């Protein structure tokens, strides 16, 4: 026998060591790695060594033993056994235990004969649990679904050519019958086979764990990654989606000639209502898009699903006013209560000059867990009340968008028919942001017609009847006779096509989720790509949702004024005296306002975070101790005035914010605009932020501005009134447009024309003109360079101080010879007014 150190024995040992290392490498290969990629001879060598090691533990193998083992393993590897897919190590281990193909292990071959199946365990199901009914095949080919696409098509109902039904015609339309709680036989507007197939696909998920279904749905929906972007929920992105698809008809409505109905420079706001829409995603989108150029009214059910205005991170919730029907802010917001519908309607009309809103959004829904197939029936009154609310508050020519579910029952289709009669155009639309597997779709209505009051009153009576029949065996089954609906063939055909189209898409989407539940490796590869395409198309920045950070008022002030010289804000007005009276010689260039207290700068950082500053650099911004709210990034020039209402003991006092001028409105820098335009924008801004439903809040008003040549109008508003706490001595008071009065301290006089321009009046053409004193050029149109920006108006302003030395009439003995009387100023203005007395 050769020694271990002999060359003949050492070489095979080194070879064996290399093969052993290869064996250890192969034995650690996972089941997911293809064994066939490994060289067959190397596998045989490695596994033979492993087998040899197990048989000769503690012995040193020689070259002859190795050759025999290699040969044996090669024979095993080449067999045609159905177990040949297992490596030879496994086969040899089984052979050592006495395994023979077709027999079980054990003394009497009583062991298991079949291979143990791969685990089908899914999620957190109990070990071995199978869901009877779910694991069966649906026999639906979902793979031929359309390719994901960011571009969508809209199909409108044909234009309604029939007259809007009147109360006489509708007097016998409402049909009351036995309450119906089945949907399977509703085949008037959808094929029976298609309806049953859709209901079957829905029912399959009844026994599936909700979380498991949601995970599969997330992977299956190609549009799932759009989510809510930086808004508070996905609903906001649905509105963004539909607003784009319908050519911005909500956020940028057009007139009959196709021109924008509203411009940002106009004084009119875009009014909208958001009903049954907590927490408010629709409104957050609209206010993000329009900023302070829009004002929203909202009504939704009080409780956990109320508006969450504090979560409006991307928009200013100060521009939105919830009103819950009867009782106002203390109401319950139940849209099915007739009192709430009437109260909300009156509130909206009172605050939109009796015109109504430009559009209504409704997104109502509630949990129907366990009764998903009956969602349409269970939601019928909610749907009716949302339609009724739209007809109650939308102005003529306005629009409406409302979430619906399945539309199979004649009751639901009848409601759609009434909208079809009342609006110029109507369509049923499912945006790609609405998950394809649910029944959700939206009815979109464009251009409310004149003369819909009878339909509104009819729906109001139907709602009353539904309330009366609640908790009984009877129900309103029809609001429009089937004969009338089917008599309009174009409407009927569209309704059937729409239902069957959405049914088919929903069936495929449900089957796809079913497949994704069964195979957890399936996923939609283009989700990120589609998301990017959609956001670009809808002009939504791809940004994360981040809560607004709190700002230091001084830092925010410098951020808003940019590079403006800080010294401008410390300028005090020039006092109007006999010596400075000549400054107002160009009368047409000036405007004037009545003052009630000291002027301050007011900075809004959002909600009640409001600070004031008197303009001196040595002083700090001080928190305003008033109950009011302003949108963030707002900078105003104001007075805090003590307003009075009534006289004597019943007199009430309230502190109000009076706006003298505006610099920045909710991030919009308006300092370079004309003073008249700035005041108009201030009035628009105040309408947007005012809260008529909150009498507990301190009001915000814009100073009433007069032309200097019309200053005598101010004195018409002045009278002597008894002021509580003044010792019974009447004081001079100025009464504003809102019937509240305050003690005036003087008049601000503001120049609106920039040097070297001045204003004149052409008697031959009977119109004003602008004259450049340097170039001696005259023009009628307002030159841009003649507009005095805020800083010019501010440092050049004059102040006619009244105080104790002011006297209204010449008969009054002057107490201060340096102070000008009413007669002094008015006579000077009249003598220099080119328009004449």
UniProtKB/Swiss-Prot annotation:
<keyword id="KW-0007">Acetylation</keyword>
<dbReference type="GO" id="GO:0006370">
    <property type="term" value="P:7-methylguanosine mRNA capping"/>
</dbReference>
<keyword id="KW-0506">mRNA capping</keyword>
<feature type="modified residue" description="N6-acetyllysine">
    <location>
        <position position="107"/>
    </location>
</feature>
<feature type="modified residue" description="Phosphoserine">
    <location>
        <position position="90"/>
    </location>
</feature>
<feature type="binding site">
    <location>
        <position position="217"/>
    </location>
    <ligand>
        <name>substrate</name>
    </ligand>
</feature>
<dbReference type="InterPro" id="IPR000467">
    <property type="entry name" value="G_patch_dom"/>
</dbReference>
<dbReference type="InterPro" id="IPR050851">
    <property type="entry name" value="mRNA_Cap_2O-Ribose_MeTrfase"/>
</dbReference>
<dbReference type="GO" id="GO:0005654">
    <property type="term" value="C:nucleoplasm"/>
</dbReference>
<keyword id="KW-0597">Phosphoprotein</keyword>
<feature type="modified residue" description="Phosphoserine">
    <location>
        <position position="30"/>
    </location>
</feature>
<dbReference type="InterPro" id="IPR029063">
    <property type="entry name" value="SAM-dependent_MTases_sf"/>
</dbReference>
<protein>
    <recommendedName>
        <fullName>Cap-specific mRNA (nucleoside-2'-O-)-methyltransferase 1</fullName>
        <ecNumber>2.1.1.57</ecNumber>
    </recommendedName>
</protein>
<feature type="binding site">
    <location>
        <begin position="276"/>
        <end position="282"/>
    </location>
    <ligand>
        <name>S-adenosyl-L-methionine</name>
    </ligand>
</feature>
<keyword id="KW-0507">mRNA processing</keyword>
<dbReference type="GO" id="GO:0004483">
    <property type="term" value="F:mRNA (nucleoside-2'-O-)-methyltransferase activity"/>
</dbReference>
<dbReference type="InterPro" id="IPR002877">
    <property type="entry name" value="RNA_MeTrfase_FtsJ_dom"/>
</dbReference>
<keyword id="KW-0949">S-adenosyl-L-methionine</keyword>
<feature type="active site">
    <location>
        <position position="238"/>
    </location>
</feature>
<dbReference type="GO" id="GO:0006397">
    <property type="term" value="P:mRNA processing"/>
</dbReference>
<dbReference type="Pfam" id="PF01728">
    <property type="entry name" value="FtsJ"/>
</dbReference>
<dbReference type="Pfam" id="PF01585">
    <property type="entry name" value="G-patch"/>
</dbReference>
<feature type="modified residue" description="Phosphoserine">
    <location>
        <position position="52"/>
    </location>
</feature>
<feature type="domain" description="WW">
    <location>
        <begin position="751"/>
        <end position="785"/>
    </location>
</feature>
<feature type="active site">
    <location>
        <position position="363"/>
    </location>
</feature>
<feature type="modified residue" description="Phosphoserine">
    <location>
        <position position="27"/>
    </location>
</feature>
<feature type="binding site">
    <location>
        <begin position="373"/>
        <end position="375"/>
    </location>
    <ligand>
        <name>substrate</name>
    </ligand>
</feature>
<dbReference type="GO" id="GO:0003676">
    <property type="term" value="F:nucleic acid binding"/>
</dbReference>
<feature type="domain" description="RrmJ-type SAM-dependent 2'-O-MTase">
    <location>
        <begin position="230"/>
        <end position="449"/>
    </location>
</feature>
<dbReference type="InterPro" id="IPR025816">
    <property type="entry name" value="RrmJ-type_MeTrfase"/>
</dbReference>
<feature type="domain" description="G-patch">
    <location>
        <begin position="86"/>
        <end position="132"/>
    </location>
</feature>
<feature type="region of interest" description="Interaction with POLR2A">
    <location>
        <begin position="726"/>
        <end position="834"/>
    </location>
</feature>
<feature type="compositionally biased region" description="Basic and acidic residues">
    <location>
        <begin position="56"/>
        <end position="66"/>
    </location>
</feature>
<comment type="function">
    <text>S-adenosyl-L-methionine-dependent methyltransferase that mediates mRNA cap1 2'-O-ribose methylation to the 5'-cap structure of mRNAs. Methylates the ribose of the first nucleotide of a m(7)GpppG-capped mRNA and small nuclear RNA (snRNA) to produce m(7)GpppRm (cap1). Displays a preference for cap0 transcripts. Cap1 modification is linked to higher levels of translation. May be involved in the interferon response pathway.</text>
</comment>
<dbReference type="GO" id="GO:0032259">
    <property type="term" value="P:methylation"/>
</dbReference>
<feature type="binding site">
    <location>
        <begin position="202"/>
        <end position="206"/>
    </location>
    <ligand>
        <name>substrate</name>
    </ligand>
</feature>
<feature type="region of interest" description="Disordered">
    <location>
        <begin position="1"/>
        <end position="66"/>
    </location>
</feature>
<feature type="binding site">
    <location>
        <position position="233"/>
    </location>
    <ligand>
        <name>S-adenosyl-L-methionine</name>
    </ligand>
</feature>
<feature type="active site" description="Proton acceptor">
    <location>
        <position position="403"/>
    </location>
</feature>
<dbReference type="InterPro" id="IPR001202">
    <property type="entry name" value="WW_dom"/>
</dbReference>
<feature type="binding site">
    <location>
        <position position="438"/>
    </location>
    <ligand>
        <name>substrate</name>
    </ligand>
</feature>
<dbReference type="GO" id="GO:0005634">
    <property type="term" value="C:nucleus"/>
</dbReference>
């Amino acid at each position: 026998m050769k020694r271990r150190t002999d060359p003949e024995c050492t070489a095979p040992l080194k070879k064996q060591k290399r093969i052993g290392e290869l064996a250890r490498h192969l034995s650690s290969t996972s089941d997911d790695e293809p064994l066939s990629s490994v060289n067959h001879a190397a596998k045989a060598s490695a596994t033979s060594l492993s087998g040899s090691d197990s048989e000769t533990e503690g012995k040193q193998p020689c070259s002859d033993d190795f050759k025999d083992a290699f040969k044996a393993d090669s024979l095993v590897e080449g067999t045609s056994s159905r177990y040949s897919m297992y490596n030879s190590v496994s086969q040899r281990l089984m052979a050592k235990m006495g395994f023979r193909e077709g027999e079980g292990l054990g003394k009497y071959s009583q062991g298991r004969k079949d291979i143990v199946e791969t685990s089908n365990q899914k999620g957190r199901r109990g070990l071995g649990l199978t869901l009877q009914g779910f694991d069966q095949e649906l026999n639906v080919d979902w793979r031929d679904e359309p390719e994901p696409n960011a571009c969508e098509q809209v199909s409108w109902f044909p234009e309604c050519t029939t007259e809007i039904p009147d109360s006489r015609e509708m007097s016998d339309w409402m049909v009351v019958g036995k309450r119906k709680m089945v949907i399977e036989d509703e085949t008037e507007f959808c094929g029976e086979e298609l309806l049953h197939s859709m209901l079957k696909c829905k029912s399959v998920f009844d026994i599936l764990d909700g979380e498991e279904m949601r995970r599969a749905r997330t992977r299956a929906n190609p549009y799932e990654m759009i989510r809510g972007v930086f808004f508070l929920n996905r609903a906001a992105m649905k509105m963004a989606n539909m607003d784009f698809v319908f050519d911005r008809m909500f956020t940028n409505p057009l007139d009959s000639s196709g021109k924008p109905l509203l411009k940002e420079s106009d004084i009119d706001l875009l009014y909208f209502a958001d009903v049954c829409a907590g927490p408010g995603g629709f409104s957050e989108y609209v206010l993000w898009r329009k900023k302070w150029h829009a004002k929203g009214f909202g009504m939704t059910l009080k409780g956990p699903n109320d508006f969450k205005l504090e979560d409006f991170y991307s928009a200013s919730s100060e521009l939105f006013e919830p009103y819950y029907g009867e009782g106002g802010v203390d109401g319950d917001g139940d849209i099915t209560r007739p009192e709430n519908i009437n109260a909300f309607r009156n509130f909206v009309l009172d605050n939109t000059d009796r015109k109504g809103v430009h559009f209504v959004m409704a997104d109502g829904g509630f949990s129907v867990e366990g009764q998903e197939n009956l969602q349409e029936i269970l939601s019928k009154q909610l749907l009716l009340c949302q339609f009724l609310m739209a007809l109650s508050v939308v102005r003529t020519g306005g629009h409406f968008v409302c979430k619906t579910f399945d539309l199979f029952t004649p009751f639901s289709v009848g409601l759609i028919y009434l909208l079809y009669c009342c609006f110029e155009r109507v369509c049923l639309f499912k945006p790609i942001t609405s998950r394809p597997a649910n029944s959700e779709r939206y009815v979109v209505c464009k251009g409310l017609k004149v003369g819909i009051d009878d339909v509104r009153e009819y729906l109001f009576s139907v709602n009353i009847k539904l309330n009366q029949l609640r908790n009984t065996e009877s129900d309103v089954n029809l609001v429009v006779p089937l004969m009338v609906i089917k008599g309009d063939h174009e409407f009927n055909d569209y309704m059937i096509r729409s239902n069957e189209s959405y049914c088919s898409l929903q069936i495929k989407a449900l089957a796809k989720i079913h497949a994704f539940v069964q195979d957890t490796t399936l996923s939609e590869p283009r989700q990120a790509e589609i998301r990017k395409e959609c956001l670009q198309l809808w002009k939504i920045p791809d940004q994360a949702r981040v809560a607004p950070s709190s700002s230091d008022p001084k830092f925010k002030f410098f951020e808003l004024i940019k590079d403006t010289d800080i010294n401008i804000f410390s300028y005090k007005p020039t006092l109007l005296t006999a010596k400075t009276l000549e400054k107002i010689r160009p009368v047409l260039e000036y405007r004037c306002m009545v003052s009630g207290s000291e002027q301050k700068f007011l900075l809004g950082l959002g909600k009640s975070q409001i600070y004031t500053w008197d303009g001196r650099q040595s002083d700090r911004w001080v928190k305003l101790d008033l109950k009011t709210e302003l949108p963030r990034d707002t900078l105003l020039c104001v007075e805090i005035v003590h307003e009075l209402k009534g006289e004597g003991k019943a007199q009430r006092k309230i502190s109000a914010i009076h706006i003298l001028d505006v610099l920045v409105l909710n991030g919009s820098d308006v300092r370079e605009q004309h003073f008249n335009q700035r005041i108009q924008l201030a009035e628009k801004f105040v309408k947007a932020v005012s809260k008529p439903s909150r009498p507990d809040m301190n009001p915000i008003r814009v100073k009433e501005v007069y032309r200097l040549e019309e200053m005598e109008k101010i004195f018409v508003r002045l009278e002597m009134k008894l002021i509580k706490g003044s010792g019974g001595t009447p004081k001079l008071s100025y009464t504003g447009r809102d019937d509240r009065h305050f003690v005036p301290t003087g008049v601000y006089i503001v120049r609106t024309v920039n040097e070297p321009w001045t204003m004149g009046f052409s008697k031959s053409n009977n119109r004003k003109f602008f004259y450049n004193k340097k170039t001696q050029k005259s023009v009628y149109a307002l030159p841009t360079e003649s507009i005095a920006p805020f800083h010019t108006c501010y440092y050049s302003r004059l102040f006619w101080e009244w105080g104790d030395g002011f006297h209204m009439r010449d008969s009054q003995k002057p107490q201060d010879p340096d102070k000008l009387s009413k007669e002094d100023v008015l006579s000077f203005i009249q003598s220099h007014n080119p328009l004449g007395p």
